[in-house]
Amino acid sequence: MGKVYDWFEERLEIQAIADDVTSKYVPPHVNIFYCLGGITLTCFLVQVATGFAMTFYYRPTVTEAFASVQYLMTDVNFGWLIRSVHRWSASMMVLMMILHVFRVYLTGGFKKPRELTWVTGVILAVLTVSFGVTGYSLPWDQVGYWAVKIVTGVPEAIPVIGSPLVELLRGSVSVGQSTLTRFYSLHTFVLPLLTAVFMLMHFLMIRKQGISGPL
């Protein structure tokens, strides 16, 4: 093992990276509330793991979606647990995100020179809410269907572009298979990818600028 480690160390300088990560200065005013962002990240990782597991059984069609969720909950080993953890961590992620935003705002963490960190955080907050909206519809039960119908119908009040925007969101004039396909694609591919990119940017900026000082 020593030779293998030395081979990688010679090329990647792993020890220098580890020293940089473990020796970062932590201000004395930091308390447990500064962990809310990290908890949000942890919830996101749980979401990715449990969501990936559920894709093996979920079928994104209007005729099979609900039945596939029922099958996952009743017939798949620990399927009920996987879906329950996914739902619980989703709620926890939203709660931790909201608390994190309040903590950053109340402690002035959005001020110069951390404006871009704040902007990426706001984008991540929007993405988090979007996860909830798109994921809520995937079981395609009565609650999910009508939630999608209401949410996608909101932009119709916008002058000129309202109706085309609604049709873009739904994939057609009415809510149906195209809508479910769009929401499934957003929930399982587009939103996770965007979230991962903005989280990386967010943490790199925090790493570069450090934790903001006390008010």
From Swiss-Prot:
Transmembrane segments: 32-52, 90-110, 116-136, 186-206
UniProt cross-references to SUPFAM superfamilies, sorted A to Z: Transmembrane di-heme cytochromes
Gene Ontology annotations for the cellular component aspect, listed alphabetically: chloroplast thylakoid membrane
Gene Ontology terms for molecular function: electron transporter, transferring electrons within cytochrome b6/f complex of photosystem II activity; metal ion binding; oxidoreductase activity
Cleaved signal peptide residues: none
Assembly description: The 4 large subunits of the cytochrome b6-f complex are cytochrome b6, subunit IV (17 kDa polypeptide, PetD), cytochrome f and the Rieske protein, while the 4 small subunits are PetG, PetL, PetM and PetN. The complex functions as a dimer.
Protein name in UniProt: Cytochrome b6
Organism expressing this protein natively: Klebsormidium bilatum (Filamentous green alga)
Gene, per the UniProt record: petB
